[in-house]
Amino acid sequence: MNTTLFRWPVRVYYEDTDAGGVVYHASYVAFYERARTEMLRHHHFSQQALMAERVAFVVRKMTVEYYAPARLDDMLEIQTEITSMRGTSLVFTQRIVNAENTLLNEAEVLVVCVDPLKMKPRALPKSIVAEFKQ
């Protein structure tokens, strides 16, 4: 399996924070989603092209552990890798670190490949399997 770590930078904006002045927990989920999308794009799999092939990914399960907060204007790095691949699913392991490389939280995300018209599982495209099995 291609275990190359994909790194995606993000800055914390006011809209990402809560009344306590720290990043709202759900904002991390959005950061993770964007990083997975950017990882696929980096490997030449755009969401639009995948949809044209009747391929979409839906989150089946997500586990997040929070260790330390991020704050307004912090620069963060979202680290993403595919740690498991099966016939219809991928498991992403993702971490968010700050500029000091402190681990703020980490997630394991199980996504299932579906036909977006039927919303039923389908096999992962051979091109994705080939790209990430290298």
Curated annotation (Swiss-Prot):
Membrane topology per record: Peripheral membrane protein
Compartments where located: Cell inner membrane
Active site (UniProt): 18
UniProt EC number: 3.1.2.-
Main localisation: membrane
Swiss-Prot/TrEMBL GO biological process terms: lipid metabolic process
Molecular function as annotated in GO: fatty acyl-CoA hydrolase activity; thiolester hydrolase activity
Disulfide bridge partners, by residue number: none
Keywords attached to this entry: Cell inner membrane, Cell membrane, Hydrolase, Lipid metabolism, Membrane
A cellular component term, taken from the record's GO annotations: plasma membrane
PANTHER family for the chain: 4-HYDROXYBENZOYL-COA THIOESTERASE FAMILY MEMBER, ACYL-COA THIOESTER HYDROLASE YBGC
Family label: Belongs to the 4-hydroxybenzoyl-CoA thioesterase family.
NCBIfam families recorded: PRK10800.1, thio_ybgC, YbgC/FadM family acyl-CoA thioesterase
Quaternary structure and interacting proteins, as annotated: Interacts with ACP, PlsB and PssA, forming altogether a complex at the inner membrane.
Function noted in UniProt: Thioesterase that appears to be involved in phospholipid metabolism. Some specific acyl-ACPs could be physiological substrates. Displays acyl-CoA thioesterase activity on malonyl-CoA in vitro, catalyzing the hydrolysis of the thioester bond.
Protein name in UniProt: Acyl-CoA thioester hydrolase YbgC
Organism: Escherichia coli (strain K12)
